[in-house]
Amino acid sequence: MQNPQNLIWIDLEMTGLDPDRDVIIEMATIVTDSDLNTLAEGPVIAIHQPEEVLAGMDEWNTRQHGQSGLTQRVRESTVSMAEAEAQTLAFLEQWVPKRSSPICGNSICQDRRFLYRHMPRLEGYFHYRNLDVSTLKELAARWAPQVRESFKKGNTHLALDDIRESIAELRHYRDHFIKL
């Protein structure tokens, strides 16, 4: 059921950090209510890329995505960038009205840059604001290091796992850093 207070969480895995050269290889979304309770998990999509694109990844991405199994999932996938965008939009339209939710996640500006370049319809679905958990992480590191250090991430670099960790991290900062 659509609710303008719901939040859209997204994470992308890419072949690198440059949206003009690199591409999205995995995406996932979660919708939460405003209290960070998960309402629905969207499709987790490995996006097919040709072998020459995968061969162009740097050492870190080659190792990380190879070890996680993502590179193989991308090779085996038949889902195009356009199909992934359409599937994700169809999911989000059930839960959140267009342009009502900020884009939510960790270092979310990077994801937004890739969406703007490769999935402009999806990028346009979000409100122009960002809810970036990394802002609180940076503030906690400076103002309350014990709070920052008390949250440990798994760092699987798989899209759905990363979103779940971002939501848990924001809950952690809400409970231990932000005085409500």
From Swiss-Prot:
Source taxonomy: Bacteria, Pseudomonadati, Pseudomonadota, Gammaproteobacteria, Pseudomonadales
Family as reported in the entry's similarity comment: Belongs to the oligoribonuclease family.
Stated name of the protein: Oligoribonuclease
InterPro entries to which the protein is assigned, alphabetical: Exonuclease_RNaseT/DNA_pol3 (IPR013520), Oligoribonuclease (IPR022894), RNaseH-like_sf (IPR012337), RNaseH_sf (IPR036397)
Superkingdom as given in the UniProt entry: Bacteria
Pfam families: RNase_T
CC per GO annotation: cytoplasm
Species of the source: Pseudomonas paraeruginosa (strain DSM 24068 / PA7)
UniProt keyword list: Cytoplasm, Exonuclease, Hydrolase, Nuclease
UniProt-listed Enzyme Commission number(s): 3.1.15.-
The protein's role, per its UniProt record: 3'-to-5' exoribonuclease specific for small oligoribonucleotides.
Cellular compartment(s): Cytoplasm
Any one GO biological process: DNA metabolic process
Active site per UniProt: 128
